[in-house]
A protein has these predicted regions:
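A boundary/linker detector
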Residues: 1-7, 24-29, 72-101
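Short cysteine-rich loop/turn motifs with clustered Cys
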Residues: 4-34, 58-60
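Amphipathic alpha-helical interaction segments
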Residues: 13, 45, 96-99
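Short Cys/His-centered divalent metal-binding micro-motifs
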Residues: 25-28, 32, 54-77
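Short linker/helix segments within small regulatory modules
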Residues: 39-54
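Glycine-rich loops and low-complexity Gly/Arg-rich segments
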Residues: 46, 58-61, 81-84
């Protein structure tokens, strides 16, 4: 784990008040222990330190995001990716000045 990742992880946990953001959706309070890459690091390493691609989760919810047999996103993981689809598309295909006219 790089020094940049360690620093970024701390910033994301602070941003999310050290609370699991998935549990919070269900009005539960659980301490986040993991910072999850919404679009997986293995597939998109350039997104590894991008804030919108990171979310604080408890270990139980983090395990619900990954299929542990083949490390693909689960249904829950895919739904999280869908929520960030606009940010992902803007990263993948940045708008140009030409697009604004």
């Amino acid at each position: 784990k790089s020094p940049k990742w360690i620093a970024k992880r701390g910033r994301i946990l602070r941003r999310d008040s050290y609370e699991c953001q998935n549990c919070k959706r269900y009005f539960k309070t659980k301490t986040a222990t993991t910072v999850h890459h919404i679009y997986f690091y293995e597939d998109y390493p350039k997104l590894s330190l991008v804030s919108w691609n990171l979310i604080s989760l408890c270990s139980e919810c983090h395990n619900k995001m990954h299929n542990r047999f083949d490390d693909t996103p689960t249904k829950l993981g895919i739904s999280l990716q869908e929520k960030k689809k606009k940010e992902f598309e803007n990263w993948l295909y940045p708008p140009t000045n030409r697009d604004k006219n």
